[in-house]
Amino acid sequence: MARQYSRTNPLGFTPWPVTIITALVYLALVIPLLVVQHVVPSAPGSDPAGLNLTEAWADLQVLTNGFHPYNSHRNDDVHKWLLQRVHEIIDSAPARSTDSAHPPAVFVFDDDQSNLTFSGRGNELGVYFESTNILVYIRGTEDDETQWWADPQGQPASKGGVLVNAHYDSVSTGYGATDDGMGVVSCLQLLRYFTTPGHAPRRGLVVLLNNGEEDFLNGARVYSQHPLSRLPHTFVNLEGAGAGGRASLFRSSDTEVTRPYARAPHPFGSVLSANGFEAGLISSQTDYVVLEGDLGLRGLDIAFIEPRARYHTDQDDARHTSVDSLWHMLSAAVATTEGLVDDASDQFDGAPREDGKVASGSGSKAVWFDLFGSTLAVFELHTLFALSVTLLIVAPLVLLATSIALVRADRMYLFRSTARVPGSDDFDEGVSLQGVRGFFRFPFLLVIPTGVAVGLAYLVTKINPYIIHSSEYAVWSMMISAWVFLAWFVSRVADFARPSAFHRVYVLTWMFVAEWVLLVIATVYENRYGLAGGYFVFFALSGTFLATWISYLELFALPRKSEYARQIAPPSRYASNHGSRLGTSSGEHGMDDAEDEEDDDGDDEDEARNVEEEPTESTSLLRGRGQRTTFANYVRVTGDYLHGAGDDEPRETHVYGREQAWSAGLPKWTWVLQFLLSAPIVLILVGPLALLLTAALRQTAQDGSSPLFVYIAIAVLTTLLVTPLLPFIHRYTHHIPLFLLLVFTGTLIYNLVAFPFSPSNRLKLFFLQEVDLDTGVNRAFLSGAHPFVYEVARSLPSAAGQNVSCDLSAARPKCSWYGIPPQVQATATPDTADWVSFNITRSADQPTRARFSVAGQNTRACRLVFDDPVRSFAVLDSAYDPRFPHLSPQGTQEIRLWSREWGHTWTVDVEWTVPAVDGESRGVSGRVVCLWSDGNAPGVIPALDEVRRYSPVWTAVSKLSDGLVEGSRRFEV
């Protein structure tokens, strides 16, 4: 009896085991990744020592019971409340504990003296800002016990301390629960924790509650002028760019400062997010860039990242977050800060710097990523570079050496079409091995599905670009289902037409080459630009290399080619009157590929008669019977060729389907090991990156970013995630692919026709009202995605009957109409010109200089906007710092003025360079603008109230500029 290919082996390389095992592995990894992404670890049932979660949540509710931007009276109330809470926490610390440990000394600073002038974006923006920061210094056990900060030139004698920073201002349209209320209450709990006996820090700890972050990171910049800024060398910045979920490690300076974060109970994040910030994929910034870039500290940026639709809106409130999210940030902050303040080494202390920045030493570039939200892998980029170079050299050499060994062992079937029969003459064509079959499949398997996925990205961008805003998993399902189905279909067509036992090894070889090239690119970027986001390529190539090597080692189980050729009967021909046959059955025939494709000259009657006959084991295999017609006029040959010419010898059938007979010797279970080496590592590392990118970018199109980039990124990530299936997908049964075809059909239709926004995933519209105080004319502006912004604007009652004009040229279109006049003054002021007062005095001896005195009623934020840039400016009584240049070679076109006092008068000296006309120097012109940002009371900004009341439930309102209302007056000098 003939030996049958085992179809009951649960690990055999047959359809059902392959389908079930690969599907289960993918599900077993994808489901936990989704859980980690969307389920926040529960807060502990009882408060950990030194912390009080109930108190922290109550503080968050108080902090977020109103909008509190810097330019609002509610902001002053928050400032007073925070000072009160700081003193309450300090006073509540026990005098001593049972182990006789004393609480550390604590000093509180209400900074109402510091100010600073600096330049802003594009260097054509100047900013003057006055501090209302709150600083708390917890003296470390090894700190200098003198009050060195009392001396204007005093310097701490101890090692560098640690700064924990959060900002307590919100935007004018958001309550600031995650941006940055959770950071603020976490700072309060850190204050409680480190003033609890037994938790005293070794290094000094500075807790900074800064004010003015939302208006260009002003609070962090002016912090640089406080004496305490000379103490910290490292920092932890707590931020929020979403509205709940897990707090992610956004960025870090180096390996050494990142390692303490690994102590967090639930670390979360990837170094790729830092690379994304560097590439400008996310437009907003945090205080990290000031602390790390301008001041020279080394630290981390821990922030909430999703959903961005709630960011800077009225849904950034306590109701839309949770105690669990608060605990996730707080636990990470405690673990990281404790690791930094207890560090006894000198790794964060360096030599004094000539540029005036903090002497924090230098660290090594870091690679870091979490594993299932429970462990953080962190190591030096240099280590990754060394490992990458080693793998790039060693892996090809190992495969080359194995190939040479196979050649010497006469078992190198790869890339071999024939084998010579020992002792044959030179004219003998040899025995066909069909070892080249399957080599060219991979480009088609990769390019066709990827091309279709990219095409889908363009299609969705063209038809319904914002669908990912609310339906990201519908987009992912569409991409993955299309990719897998097409890959399966192409592989099945190829396997049907030209069966090959080498499909797996050839696809793995192609994957190895492709990933080797990717690793070369990633390694170059690591070395030249310090970008570590390609770390996953190293691990992917490592797994693919081992899987490929196993396939090469499997070939040692095959018979020697010479022995195999000796056993094979002389070559014969098969033909079909239906067309050429590209793929044959088992390779014992000795037929080469050209002979496979010859036509059959037999008549139809003989063929029909042969098909009707019942074949037996003794039936001749050279009679043309057993053929069956397939699509595309190909004929599948079912007979096996025997050793010798006799018909009574048993045939070798220990092969799969119509694959080559010599493959009977290949191991049947090693595919499982290969799959486990190549696929899980990709899912574990690339899967979180895909979810992180989706969460961070899926709702950025409303901010003016290109949605096409996100769809293309998903298409590319789909390819990375599913490519490990390609070596095995030709063995899949039809059940999953056909199901995925249905999924693709449904999700494609949905993604093209569904409305992209919902009450839980709202479209942000950005509001601003401008008032010409000279004429009293005002216009309300809404900016947002087209055409939705126009539809909302024209539906408002005040816009009825008006010609709503829209500027569609910008990345984020802006529509305007004559709005309802604002009532931003505390008392009725009929003449709008009185809202802003200014005086300009031109210098008599210097005709290109003038002094501006500017003030606004019921505001502490104004601007000077010039028609042409001025050469220089200086604000009276301002501090200047060489670390923050305030002048630009291109000049300054706008000067922003912020004060801690209401109705403050700023004095600004301006100098300009304008060519003389008729011997007389020309002056300058522009506008004096003041801002009003307090939208807490109804009726103060009726146009904003109207937008909130009458806009659809799927829209949200955010600020377009620093102010909600901007009133301006014209000037000429």
From Swiss-Prot:
Location of this chain's protein in the cell: Vacuole membrane
Residues that coordinate or bind Zn(2+) 1: 167, 179, 239
Membrane topology type: Multi-pass membrane protein
Enzyme Commission number, as recorded: 3.4.-.-
UniProt-annotated catalytic positions: 213
Annotated GO biological process: proteolysis
Cofactor note (record): Binds 2 Zn(2+) ions per subunit.
Region (Disordered): 572-623
UniProt GO molecular function: metal ion binding; metalloexopeptidase activity
Cofactor(s) for this UniProt protein: Zn(2+)
Gene3D superfamilies: Zn peptidases (3.40.630.10)
A GO CC annotation given for this chain: vacuolar membrane
Positions glycosylated per UniProt: 52, 115, 803, 839
Function text: May be involved in vacuolar sorting and osmoregulation.
Family annotation (PANTHER family): METALLOPEPTIDASE M28 FAMILY MEMBER, VACUOLAR MEMBRANE PROTEASE
Name by which UniProt lists this protein: Vacuolar membrane protease
Organism: Aspergillus clavatus (strain ATCC 1007 / CBS 513.65 / DSM 816 / NCTC 3887 / NRRL 1 / QM 1276 / 107)
